[in-house]
């Protein structure tokens, strides 16, 4: 099982997302279940290495946010059109 450390996003929007990407991070969201959607930020290089394996897309992942572990599955991955970079990931609670 993959474990990903994340932080809750403090600001949202296009400018905030661009600042995250410039800092080698990228935005993501966790939704589903009975809880409210949670906007998070992830470290780009760590997740890029994880998503290179097929198991990233088929297995349940653990995301640790503020010391709390959330079980999720990758629902949608948005990539940069020509650079080997991730733009955004949607996770659904498992």
Curated annotation (Swiss-Prot):
Keywords tagged on the record: Ribonucleoprotein, Ribosomal protein, RNA-binding, rRNA-binding
Coiled coil: none
Sample GO molecular function, one term: structural constituent of ribosome
Gene Ontology biological process: translation
Annotated Gene Ontology cellular component terms: cytosolic large ribosomal subunit
Alphabetized Pfam families for the sequence: Ribosomal_L25p (PF01386)
Stored InterPro entries: Rbsml_bL25/Gln-tRNA_synth_N (IPR020056), Ribosomal_bL25/Gln-tRNA_synth (IPR011035), Ribosomal_bL25_short (IPR020055), Ribosomal_L25_dom (IPR029751), Ribosomal_uL5_bac-type (IPR020930)
Domain of life: Bacteria
Subunit details: Part of the 50S ribosomal subunit; part of the 5S rRNA/L5/L18/L25 subcomplex. Contacts the 5S rRNA. Binds to the 5S rRNA independently of L5 and L18.
Family statement drawn from the similarity comment of this UniProt entry: Belongs to the bacterial ribosomal protein bL25 family.
Function of the molecule: This is one of the proteins that binds to the 5S RNA in the ribosome where it forms part of the central protuberance.
Name by which UniProt lists this protein: Large ribosomal subunit protein bL25
Species annotation: Shigella boydii serotype 4 (strain Sb227)
This protein's encoding gene: rplY
């Amino acid at each position: 099982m993959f474990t990903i450390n994340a932080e809750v996003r403090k600001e949202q929007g296009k400018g905030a997302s661009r600042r995250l990407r410039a800092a080698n991070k990228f935005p993501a969201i966790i939704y589903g279940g009975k809880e409210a959607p949670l906007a998070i930020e992830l470290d780009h290089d760590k997740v890029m290495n994880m998503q290179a394996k097929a198991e990233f897309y088929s297995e349940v992942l653990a995301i640790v946010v503020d010391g709390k572990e959330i079980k999720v599955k990758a629902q949608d991955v948005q990539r940069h059109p020509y650079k080997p970079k991730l733009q955004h990931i949607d996770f659904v609670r498992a």
